[in-house]
Amino acid sequence: MKFIDEARIEAIAGNGGNGSASFRREKFVPFGGPDGGDGGRGGSVFAVADRNINTLIDFRYAKKHVARNGENGRGSDCYGAAGEDITLRMPVGTLITDMDTGEVIADLTEHGQRVCLAEGGMGGWGNLHFKSSTNRAPRQQVDGKPGERRMLKLELKVLADVGLLGMPNAGKSTFISHISNARPKVADYPFTTLHPNLGVVRVDHEQSFVVADIPGLIEGAAEGAGLGHQFLRHLQRTGLLLHIVDLAPFDEAVDPVAEARAIVNELKKYDETLYEKPRWLVLNKLDMVPEDERAAKVKDFLKRYKWKGPVFQISALTGEGCRELIYAIKDHLQAIKAEEAAALAEPDIRLDDRLHNVDQDQREA
């Protein structure tokens, strides 16, 4: 199935039905009084997150989604039927934005999360509501309210714990296929990966994490060059970035240090927040470097690159060093979760002070 991570749709809710202006008509009851029912509520348009969907392709072609109008009220105090709601199933990770106002309507981050995109109009009142002691035969009624109409932008940002960065042919796809159940296309030419791939890494029977592989970046990606800039948004939800560098490029004229710097520069241009995320350096293709030259090659790279963060040396093809990297990632993600849990459990001192002041005021009163 083709991967589509952006779409624009129009959500049109149903109008409310009109209220009825009618009067009770029965034998031997010449002045039966008003009995007009209310109009039905217009149908609403909802979105629900579904983990079984991984693309927005359905919304690339079906752009208009219209809910039914509510039925008009009738005599004998009959209310109009409500319009049927419609529900749009979207991938988990979809960000929904109102194109006219720029308002973020919803961020669907959990399976089953449901949100209203366009609310149906309220049904109008029938003349039964206007009966009073001075107006025994009201002829006024209220028309239904129009439903909401919105132009929406849908952006899919995949939910992953770890994101892979690197130049084309750095070995990202080989790496994710080695450590996870993902099976991306692997070939010896640039831009083999054309869309994001997700892989679940099983550390043991109880622990796992998700890795996202995006198309390789090239210099100028933030301005639109290559493919990667289209998919950098998929790394915004990750907790850790792995910068994979080809330590032994096929073309000897290519400098791995210059390529690594180019990737970091593109990241900074695209999004400062993404640039500030925790980032580890992963030197790949050790199998292409003779064992007696590895230490010197790595030392020279780190000296020229001036990198002081975590460094891992691997061969995605043979699996050398991959297991150690997996366990380090697991420990890092566990530490992040522990910090988040501690932050949630920490009491709000400001709230305690307010409660103390309220209690003291009550005692003095």
UniProtKB/Swiss-Prot annotation:
Its cofactor is Mg(2+). One of its GO terms (molecular function) is magnesium ion binding. Residues 160-334 form the OBG-type G domain. GO terms for biological process: ribosome biogenesis. Residues 1-159 form the Obg domain. It comes from the Bacteria. GO terms for cellular component: cytoplasm. Mg(2+) binds at S173, T193. It is found in: Cytoplasm. Its EC number is 3.6.5.-. Belongs to the TRAFAC class OBG-HflX-like GTPase superfamily. OBG GTPase family. Gene3D superfamilies: GTP1/OBG domain, P-loop containing nucleotide triphosphate hydrolases. Monomer. Keywords: Cytoplasm, GTP-binding, Hydrolase, Magnesium, Metal-binding, Nucleotide-binding. This is GTPase Obg. An essential GTPase which binds GTP, GDP and possibly (p)ppGpp with moderate affinity, with high nucleotide exchange rates and a fairly low GTP hydrolysis rate. Plays a role in control of the cell cycle, stress response, ribosome biogenesis and in those bacteria that undergo differentiation, in morphogenesis control. InterPro entries: G_OBG, GTP-bd, GTP-bd_Obg/CgtA, GTP1-OBG_CS, GTP1_OBG_dom, GTP1_OBG_dom_sf, OBG_GTPase, P-loop_NTPase. GTP binds at residues 166-173, 191-195, 213-216, 284-287, 315-317. Signal peptide: none annotated. The gene is obg.
